[in-house]
A protein has these predicted regions:
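Cleavable N-terminal export/targeting peptides
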Residues: 1-65
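Short loop/turn motifs that connect adjacent beta-strands in outer-membrane beta-barrel proteins
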Residues: 78-87, 115-121, 147-152, 198-199, ...
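C-terminal outer-membrane beta-barrel translocator/porin domains of Gram-negative envelope proteins
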Residues: 248-352, 357
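C-terminal hydrophobic structural anchor segments
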Residues: 348-382
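Flexible, surface-exposed loop regions and adjacent strand-edge segments
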Residues: 171-176, 219-225, 276-278, 312-321, ...
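Sequence/structural signature of outer-membrane beta-barrel proteins
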Residues: 112-116, 129-135, 160-164, 209-213, ...
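Gram-negative/organellar outer-membrane beta-barrel architecture
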Residues: 81-91, 95-233, 238, 334, ...
Length: 421
């Protein structure tokens, strides 16, 4: 009953406000339904050729805005199908929900523009959130393209006041060994990618993670054994490569995605200790059956400590990937360790022909080592069903409502905007 009540309240909130809280890490703006209609609200971020097939697709599809107009005679603000060099701004209140935050009240905003007529859409997305668990988050995410798409500038700034529990090291850790922590956190990531050929980009950047005022309420545990600190700084350079052939970054129907990041943290740049890591993110999207709107999505995410000894909060951890989407079925931070190996599959299918409702079933598996130099431990599964509600039929953006299950009785509701991967 509690789950049903939470879900009902959240869906009502999504329909009456702009659900941008979960979208903040997707690096792309989406159509919003302002509480008060605003001029020039952004309708989509995906440029679709104005062909007969595209027009027919639009005519046959229904999204949340169409339903609001049909049932409540609510007409969203005038929108446009393309983004020009003139920036488009949207600032709206929203609500969000995750296992680690519970309910959150959010003020979200985004800006979208093109540097040139043929350039990809550049975006700046931000939000300020206050959560039921007394957390404060302020992220600013930017994805800027040059006029000729030769360069891509990617920024990730975050300021958090973040009470959160840890459960020990390795994927053998016990959910009942919860250790409540509290800390403040600043992240500054700046990366520049240059076009190499086709869909391939490569480059580098500067990365810093700064944790301070770290406290915990646990007894003698893995955190104490690993080494408690009141602060930690990881500062260094990164080398990056990106290959992206997806037909739609928000809701891919075909294509693939591969990203590699090598990170080297150096003492002379202020790091608490020298260490390096490697992240390999690979995804594949397959129409199944071919020619349908159903998709089999596959994902592999490996986060590996190559050498050195990262501070406890800098170790790979569940849902601390770039978009906080690994490990549905578990709370953020449930598993932590020097090595993380993760895989997930999700089958996405249409329920109604008009595209308003769809469904998914997902299955994931993750394995962690404990401290550096130890072996990978047990494989922990996560699985569950999900519902998709079409928020924007042009960009194919969905409201994603999933219920995940994991080991040791772990379970919970997961709500996002835009597909998980």
């Amino acid at each position: 009953m509690k789950v049903f009540l939470r879900l009902s309240i959240f869906i009502i909130g999504l329909l009456l406000t702009a659900p941008l809280f979960a979208q903040q890490n997707k690096d792309v703006p989406i159509k919003v339904i302002p509480v008060k209609p605003k001029k020039d609200a952004l309708k989509d971020t995906i440029h679709i050729a104005d062909t007969l097939a595209a027009r027919k697709m639009r005519e046959n599809q229904i999204d949340v805005a169409d339903m609001l107009e049909a049932f409540f005679n609510y007409k969203p603000a005038t929108t446009v199908d393309t983004v020009t060099s003139k920036p488009t701004f949207t600032i709206v209140p929203a609500i969000g929900y995750t296992l680690v935050t519970k309910f959150a009240v959010v003020l979200s905003g985004n800006m979208a523009f093109r540097a040139g007529p043929k350039s990809r859409i550049s975006t700046i997305i931000t939000s300020i959130a206050f959560t039921q668990n007394k957390q404060f988050t302020f992220p600013v995410l930017s994805n800027i393209w040059s006029k000729d798409n030769k360069y891509n500038f990617i920024g990730d700034f975050r300021l958090y006041k973040y009470p959160q529990s840890t459960f020990g090291l390795g994927s053998n850790s016990n959910i009942h060994h919860e250790d409540p922590m509290d800390y403040s956190y600043v992240r500054i990531y700046e990366t520049v990618l240059r076009h190499v050929t086709g869909n391939l980009y490569a480059g580098g950047g500067y990365i810093i993670d700064d944790h301070w005022n770290i406290t915990d309420k646990g007894r003698y545990n893995d955190y104490a054994v690993y080494g408690k600190n009141s602060f930690s700084i990881a500062s260094g350079f990164s080398l990056n490569a990106l290959l992206d052939s997806r037909d739609n970054a928000i809701n891919p129907y075909k294509g693939g995605y591969a990203s590699v990041q090598y990170r080297d943290n150096l003492n002379f740049l202020g790091s608490s200790g020298g260490w390096s890591s490697l992240i390999i993110d690979v995804r594949r999207y397959i129409n199944l059956p071919e020619g349908s709107d159903n998709v089999l999505a596959l994902w592999s995410y490996d986060w590996l400590t190559l050498n050195g000894r990262p501070a406890y909060l800098d170790l790979p951890s569940t849902q601390w990937d770039a978009f906080s989407t690994t490990g549905r079925g578990y709370i953020q931070g449930r598993f932590r360790g020097a090595q993380m190996v993760y895989a997930e599959g999700e089958y996405r299918y249409r329920i109604f022909d008009n595209g308003l409702l769809g469904g998914v079933f997902f299955l994931n598996a993750e394995s962690f080592s404990a401290a550096p130099g130890t072996k990978l431990q047990a494989i922990q599964p996560g699985y569950g069903p999900g519902l998709r509600i079409k928020l924007n039929k042009i960009s194919k953006t969905n409201i994603c409502i999933d219920y995940g299950f994991g080991s040791q009785g772990s379970k919970g509701l997961f709500i996002d905007v835009g597909e998980i991967f």
